[in-house]
Amino acid sequence: MEEQAFPNVFLIGEHSEYYAEISEQHPAILLTVFNNDMEFAFEKWAGMLVEMENFAKEINYDINGVKLFLHVYFNPDGKIKYLSYYPKPNSKNVPNAEITAFFKSFAKVYQLQVNADIGFQHYASASFPTFFGNINKETAKK
């Protein structure tokens, strides 16, 4: 795969010829990276979504009403290598170019607090606003 030609943010279903290679580069999953501690892994994921929401507020981007499937591929240091998404049918209508630009900007600045041995991935759905006000903020920052 040509690193330069392949986008780091794309719609799920696009570039399907590269999925096997991307998955090989990120063989672990979020849960195993956090020693199969479901609560801790969930708080890390929720913390990332809260950071996404905060980033949207910082740049004055209205993400509220957006509902989508996310597949995020992380480097071992927690930086986002690839992010693919697909809007849910009940999502607020947002142009793909706009949400792609948002995710590209977020991926440049975000780093999950983790020290993994290998790349890892997580696939889940997300809705904004998150309503994760009760997550343990200390866990999310660890």
What are these regions (language model features)?
Residues M1-K142:
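Charge-biased low-complexity segments
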